[in-house]
């Protein structure tokens, strides 16, 4: 009888230890997950680079119907929100019906050929913003620098390659300066 009671105590003690271990492990896992999610240093370099230079703040007053669409498009394609909001402000001043003298269309001022390549309708505000964010991200992937991505968005990637940097065109230099802030 004494050995049965002793076996039951050992069994309860083992269960308690196992439960304690599981609880402590769960708490540590939750803390580590939170710490990792909030630590820029622990993020992969490709993710850290997304935010380089993005001490940029969108200071425009527009908060209308396209604002959230633009923020969502930026997030969806890994573009810093403030950078994309500043781009849209510069490109069209939030005018969905804008058409430039060169033929660029909509909020993100997509050229018809670029819109076709991206498979978006440039006259649809949501598709236009999605295409603009996707195209800016593609330029970032190509040049690995947000300022060069902006220059490529404005002057074309070939011009950035040809000049091995921001092309010496006053329009493009001013474009990058206005959006980037320097």
Language-model features: where?
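Phosphate-coordinating loops and pocket residues in cytosolic domains that bind phosphorylated ligands
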Residues: 89, 112, 162
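Cell-wall glycan-active module
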Residues: 1-86, 181-182
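Acidic helix/loop microenvironments that form the catalytic cleft of cell-wall polysaccharide enzymes
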Residues: 92, 135, 145-170, 175
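Solvent-exposed, acidic/flexible segments
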Residues: 56-67, 76-77, 81, 99-104, ...
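Short, functionally critical alpha-helical segments immediately adjacent to catalytic or ligand/cofactor-binding
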Residues: 68-71, 78-95, 129-134, 149-156, ...
């Amino acid at each position: 009888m004494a050995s049965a009671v002793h076996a039951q105590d050992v069994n309860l003690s083992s269960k308690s230890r196992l439960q304690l271990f599981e609880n402590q492990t769960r708490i540590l896992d939750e803390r580590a997950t939170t710490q990792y999610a909030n630590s820029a240093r622990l993020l992969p370099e490709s993710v850290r680079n997304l935010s380089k230079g993005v001490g940029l703040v969108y200071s425009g007053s527009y908060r209308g119907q396209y604002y959230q669409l633009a923020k969502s498009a930026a997030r969806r394609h890994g573009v810093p929100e403030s950078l994309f909001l500043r781009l849209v402000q510069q490109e069209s001043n939030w005018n969905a019906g804008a058409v430039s003298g060169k033929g660029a269309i909509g909020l993100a001022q997509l050229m018809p050929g670029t819109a076709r390549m991206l498979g978006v309708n440039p006259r649809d505000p949501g598709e236009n913003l999605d295409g603009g964010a996707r195209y800016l991200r593609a330029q970032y992937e190509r040049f690995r620098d947000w300022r060069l991505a902006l220059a490529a968005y404005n002057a074309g990637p070939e011009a950035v390659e040809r000049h091995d940097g921001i092309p010496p065109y006053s329009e493009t230099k001013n474009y990058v300066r206005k959006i980037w802030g320097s």
